[in-house]
UniProtKB/Swiss-Prot annotation:
Active site: 273
Keyword field contains Acyltransferase: no
Protein name: DNA ligase 4
UniProt cross-references to InterPro entries, sorted A to Z: Adenylation_DNA_ligase_IV, BRCT_dom, BRCT_dom_sf, DNA_ligase_ATP-dep, DNA_ligase_ATP-dep_C, DNA_ligase_ATP-dep_cent, DNA_ligase_ATP-dep_CS, DNA_ligase_ATP-dep_N
GO molecular function: ATP binding; DNA binding; DNA ligase (ATP) activity; metal ion binding
Native source species: Pongo abelii
Residues involved in ATP binding: 271-274, 278, 331, 345, 367, 427, 432, 449, 451
Gene Ontology terms: cellular component: DNA ligase IV complex; DNA-dependent protein kinase-DNA ligase 4 complex; nonhomologous end joining complex
Region (Required for catalytic activity): 610-620
Amino acid sequence: MAASQTSQTVASHVPFADLCSTLERIQKSKGRAEKIRHFREFLDSWRKFHDAFHKNQKDVTDSFYPAMRLILPQLERERMAYGIKETMLAKLYIELLNLPRDGKDALKLLNYRTPTGTHGDAGDFAMIAYFVLKPRCLQKGSLTIQQVNDLLDSIASNNSAKRKDLIKKSLLQLITQSSALEQKWLIRMIIKDLKLGVSQQTIFSVFHSDAVELHNVTTDLEKVCRQLHDPSVGLSDISITLFSAFKPMLAAIADIEHIEKDMKHQSFYIETKLDGERMQMHKDGDVYKYFSRNGYNYTDQFGASPTEGSLTPFIHNAFKTDIQICILDGEMMAYNPNTQTFMQKGTKFDIKRMVEDSDLQTCYCVFDVLMVNNKKLGHETLRKRYEILSSIFTPIPGRIEIVQKTQAHTKNEVIDALNEAIDKREEGIMIKQPLSIYKPDKRGEGWLKIKPEYVSGLMDELDILIVGGYWGKGSRGGMMSHFLCAVAEKPPPGEKPSVFHTLSRVGSGCTMKELYDLGLKLAKYWKPFHKKAPPSSILCGTEKPEVYIEPCNSVIVQIKAAEIVPSDMYKTGCTLRFPRIEKIRDDKEWHECMTLDDLEQLRGKASGKLASKHFYVGGDDEPQEKKRKAAPKMKKVIGIIEHLKAPNLTNVNKISNIFEDVEFCVMSGTDSQPKPDLENRIAEFGGYIVQNPGPDTYCVIAGSKNIRVKNIILSNKHDVVKPAWLLECFKTKSFVPWQPHFMIHMCPSTKEHFAREYDCYGDSYFVDTDLNQLKEVFSGIKNSNEQTPEEMASLIADLEYRYSWDCSPLSMFRRHTVYLDLYAVINDLSTKNEGTRLAIKALELRFHGAKVVSCLAEGVSHVIIGEDHSRIADFKAFRRTFKRKFKILKESWITDSIDKCELQEENQYLI
């Protein structure tokens, strides 16, 4: 029966190879429009086949879902985890293909992140597997999309059942029935990273105009594909529904200096930013469901009914008797009943997996309500939702509580609240507009957040030593993407440290250029780390690096982090939470790094929190350490860290969608169009703004080449474009194609595209050129004083051949170098015979492309003789001394060739 139902789907008839070839074309396409075209073609063909296949059927549930769940595997919620990552896949491939464990191909798979210099695919396991599998696989697979999904379902369910033997069996079926190209995409689907270069929002928008919004309120791919199968039919009501996970509303990073403006100079709410797990609760009588911010179902942990789970039995009776249905949004926290305090997420527990005999208990801290008794509240103001929230349940301390808020009006009240949060060791504060409505998956639509680490000068920083490294993958393939850092054991007086204890792994905070430069600086010192024979100077916990560096060859990095938390993974017994590299301490020697004693002192200073200063505003004030009167040695500028600042786009009204789903990074503007103006205009046309370019950034806009722009150009990862291109787009209200005069720098793929479309001077091969464009092209051509017209002859001949102009009569002598017998003494220019017919022939030769010379030398191809034959013997004597022999012809060869519009056979005119 199941097989019969399966055969009634489109997916059971569409070859998996067709999907893979489409994905391959999408990935290889440069522009967004071309990527969309390939996806749309596949989608349209699916829909046409679907309509024909189900022509006379009613209530059809078959949809695009089987393909969509493979195209967007990161959004998959129905299928359980595969339990497979790159290393596990490598071991399975080695076993299933019976590869020699120490063989070249096995080592390639196991060490996929280590650069080899062959294909440049370091860090991309799927590509490396492709080259290993290519000689061992079918040319074309036989699996359908339905069969692939069935096998992936089998892998997921057997992983849950811990049946490794059945996992191998399913993988063997995939390997033996699919090509290397198909397996490349299968691997990416299993790892849930397709690297298509196109966002899920773009895929959704092509599928249906309502798809993004429906997915935001359901996080259900199957529901999106089934309800929106017909692109011409929209949904009248797209809103949060009971027992469907929605994407929660998010907060943007706030700039304290602009807080009053961001809140439109009206009163606002301040709440504590809780350090737990964002969770939504759906309730219908005795039935409960819990979903994380990413739509994962945690009902089994927290309880589907009043008789089960770590939370539901304790809160069920807290709800008012008239509350049958509700949807709540809040933070799941771990509560210590002995100390009556909430635990921070960095400590050793996982709220989603707490066991019953734990000393901690689950507490749900609620800050919003989206539905009560079937009444949807998403379009109500936050003030109204708060009023309703207070009437839904009776708070139970340590089990279910309402997040307390205070009403504020000024920046100083925000500063006081932030300083209080620092004193209480809290994560930060939230700022919310009372009139804001709930917008799923939207960031900064009336909600803002402030954490101490967002504000420069409030955090203690650590100077620690790099002792190990990890090869990157994806865009960081082939370079060190993360570093293992350590602190020193305090040495005896007068000596340098010799033993280092690992503390943390860090990789964020660096640009690609900085990572590359740092890796280059240390490149010659890296050594493979052997777990069985580790270096005596570096003591590790369970976290081991892939390569290590002798401390004396390394550098110190300055690290900023939120706090120091316990950890068994590092030798120090603790690690850093949210670490990022601030800078490389070139001013310090390797032995001047932090010691274990320094670390313990810092750890005990504020219960591990690294925010130990208060925020002050005005005059020469600066962040001050709590309970200390001495000012810090170095002044620190107060404000949001520059690269985290985002433009204030709250008052921007969208006027066009030409930049929809396009990400820009504006580095600088022009005098007439400064950076903020360009960013506002981009937002008006539907674009996104980032302050640092990433893998999804379409291009970097630069009005001048400052140091940041030069670094981006050096990285060769991004296209850098003049603001003039943006202004042209704004003027025409269209996505104007790039032209050479718009470009400051082109990444390799763009250069390749332009080479196919334009010549080296920027003139298009295919698009008609107007007068202004031609003037612009000519103005960019540098004058060359070195080349004479004669020296240009070879270049002109090549051009004529390329464009098939070489058959023109005006080009017939182009490749000939001719000496005419115009001189009484050969090569003596003072003996020229004036007024002869040969002088006219010289002009005719030049007109028809020949190079006419006045000196008989190596390289001459023809000598032309007139009526006077007295110097023929001299010419023949000259010819015997030349490596390349020239021909001596009658002048009639020129006349006859011109008269007949083609070169005549030379042998008839030889002398």
